[in-house]
């Protein structure tokens, strides 16, 4: 969604850069998109990995889906979560190339990723079902790296310090979020039982606690993207 919203702005800056050679606006927009994607998807990935089992239990554990199948699917979700933020970054970087009318670059990288995915799927499926989503996660990392390298070569730099600063702060906040989510969920899961309403309560409480802790951590760590999101929310309320 972030990449889609920023696409018109990217296209405008790309057109200007093609005429003037000034990539500052384009560079700042790509950097902003990557930082906001990190702000939203890193904690989401961490929480979905840590709470994979209760999430799968609520969504699927009924009918022919037996309790002993839940850990297997939960492991797949946790493995897939490892590449979630990179998947979002790839969408943003693809839009950057599309706005520059160099569609062939992300297309070529995607084809390379397709072959890599096939090789890794063949190599990792033996470790268990979670090897397949892990392969996808690794390909997301590789694709993101390739897109960044090529894009930096075309626009000189990518505001790497700003991106690294945001990612570092968000990773620290997300680590605490993961700990709190687990600490809240585990005793509730043991105490309330495994009925569907009880699972909804325990998982809901863990997610609510995670959200509060993430907000507080981002405030303490001065994550600028939080202010942008809150400002957007205020403007939407006034609209």
Language model: regions and residue ranges:
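Membrane-embedded alpha-helical bundles of multi-pass transporters/translocases
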Residues: 1-239
């Amino acid at each position: 969604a972030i990449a889609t919203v920023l696409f018109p702005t990217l296209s405008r800056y790309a057109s200007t850069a093609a005429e003037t050679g000034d990539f500052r606006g384009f560079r700042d927009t790509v950097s902003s998109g990557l930082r906001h994607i990190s702000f939203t998807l890193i904690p989401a990935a961490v929480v979905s990995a840590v709470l994979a089992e209760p999430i799968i239990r609520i969504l699927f554990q009924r009918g022919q889906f037996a309790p002993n199948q839940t850990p297997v699917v939960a492991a797949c979700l946790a493995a897939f979560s490892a590449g979630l933020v990179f998947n979002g970054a790839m969408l943003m970087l693809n839009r950057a190339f599309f706005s520059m009318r160099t569609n062939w670059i992300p297309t070529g990288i995607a084809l390379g990723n397709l072959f890599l995915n096939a090789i890794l799927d063949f190599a990792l499926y033996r470790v268990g079902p979670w090897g397949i989503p892990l392969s996808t996660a690794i390909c997301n990392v590789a694709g993101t790296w390739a897109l960044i390298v090529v894009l930096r070569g075309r626009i000189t730099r990518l505001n790497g310090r700003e991106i690294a600063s945001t990612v570092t702060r968000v990773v620290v906040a997300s680590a605490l979020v993961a700990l709190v989510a687990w600490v809240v969920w585990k005793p509730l899961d043991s105490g309330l039982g495994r009925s569907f309403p009880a699972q909804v309560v325990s998982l809901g409480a863990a997610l609510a606690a995670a959200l509060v802790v993430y907000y507080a951590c981002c405030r303490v760590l001065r994550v600028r993207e939080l202010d942008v999101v809150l400002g957007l929310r205020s403007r939407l309320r006034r609209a």
